[in-house]
Amino acid sequence: MRLGTQTFPGHSRRSPLLAFALVLFVLFAAWKISEYIVAGQTGNLFLVGLGFAVLVLVVAMLNNWRNGLYFFLAWLLFEDLARKYLGNNMAIYFGKDFLVTVVYLSFFAASRRKEIQIFRPPFLIPLLLFVWFGVIQVFNPASSSLLYGVLGLKLYFYYVPLIFVGYALFETEGDLRRFFSINLFLAVLIAGLGSAQAILGHTFLNPEHPAEDIRELSQLYRVAPISGVIIYRPTSVFVSDGRFASYMILAWLIAFGVGGYLLLRSRRGRLLASLILAVISAGVILSGSRGAVLWTAGSALVCAAAFLWGAPRRQGEALRVMRSIQRSLLVGGLAIIIVFLAYPEALLSRVAFYSETLSLDSPHSELVYRVRDYPLQNFLMAFTYDRWPYGFGIGTASLGVQYVSRIMHVPPMNIGVESGYGSIVIEMGIVGLALWLIMSFAVVFACWRIVRRLKGSPWFPIGFVIFWFAFLLLFPFTFNGLQPYQNFVLNAYLWLLVGILFRLPTLEISAQNTIAGGAAMPRRRWIR
């Protein structure tokens, strides 16, 4: 008997059935596609193609959760672009949640096979307390529907497991380089498109007839109070200018941290990293967002001082870090000069808007009001609601409540303030705010302890910018508004980057591309 001709029971019966089913599927797909083409329904045709692509991605993600994570991040960043051109389709909106669920399932299967490392976050107890209280708030009697609670749980906690994914993501230094290379490529693409849109106006990268829900978000112009110049606030690949501006802050921090890492590790890639930082800096300036400009400028000062403090204690290392900071400042200045030479009107109009609304000498300065008075007033407004001790329920004042009310026909709550801390009080009462502050402090403090352990190592610049991003998002950003934390891009990157931060002390440094006389890692210690 020859093994090559051996057949198995049922094989001869199943193959014709599978072939017949495949033929039927192909014929049905061809029929539907031809219908869409004849009817001119290109949107439906695009959805069919997108669905098929997602199916292929799911199979690949189940086989390799690390590649699946990169697919998820790419979808996360470019999902809004599809939403804009498909009439704000809610099926597209939930695509990222489906993909991250596939990542979780694949990751869980790998953990069951003992293929990955799992760690216990030192802030796990404060985090679980806040999660427990959030689950209880789903059943708050003041909430008009449990669907608001489901929305709140998703916005607050759905991406928290990414911390474990981030911790297990890297096995070698090459994995780290790959992760940040991919993310910087996506960031420079988004920044470049946003800069082009700032110059060309809202007709670029936006549909001719956007959906009613997102029309105003994609066509927002601001007027300088003195000169009267009009500037457009670009959205790039996102549906709103605020999401683009907040992503630019994150992208700038990542680019600055990776640049510091390359300074201590390798001469390769420094020039490219500087060019990426220049493009992102131009995106920040052209975003038209005063918050993005101020937070990026402040972060540059803080990170520069931190890099000097965390430089390796070797002869000449502090000088090299100082030169790197000077190079970064020169790159930022070069980006401004290039934009000025190429598109002077686009730059000067935004400079006029920034100076007329932020300069303390300007009669129309809003700096003190927007930084101190307005957020504080909105926070105190939360205590004018009679249920401030108990709240109305998680999700009742969150991002996206209008979709729950409209699509699911749920009675609107009509509550909320712009302050993020105030929104937490409205949703979960004063106890919820206290638990949020405890959790936030625990997360940031744990991150700071890791950063101190990284002092003197090549990982320090990356570690510090992750710590700084976590601090900004959990404290000042959320105090001003709940939207930054509930922004799915910032939320997903927060927990993913925190997991990466906790992995850095145990990540081995490869001998490849090491600068002669470069810094050595401190003694390896495992996180428990």
Please place each PLM-identified region on the residue numbering:
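Hydrophobic, aromatic-rich transmembrane alpha-helices
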Residues: 49-63, 100-113, 251-263, 431-454
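N-terminal hydrophobic segments of proteins, predominantly signal-anchor/transmembrane helices
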Residues: 58-88, 94-157
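Juxtamembrane membrane-water interface segments that cap and precede transmembrane helices
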Residues: 81-87, 222-238, 370-375, 409-423
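A membrane-periplasm/extracellular boundary helix in multi-pass inner-membrane enzymes
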Residues: 192, 197-204, 287, 292, ...
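Transmembrane alpha-helices of multi-pass inner-membrane enzymes
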Residues: 251, 296-305, 464-528
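Loop-to-helix entry and N-terminal half of a specific, functionally important transmembrane alpha helix
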Residues: 270-281, 445-480
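Long extracytoplasmic/lumenal interhelical loops at the membrane interface
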Residues: 349-352, 356-428, 447-454
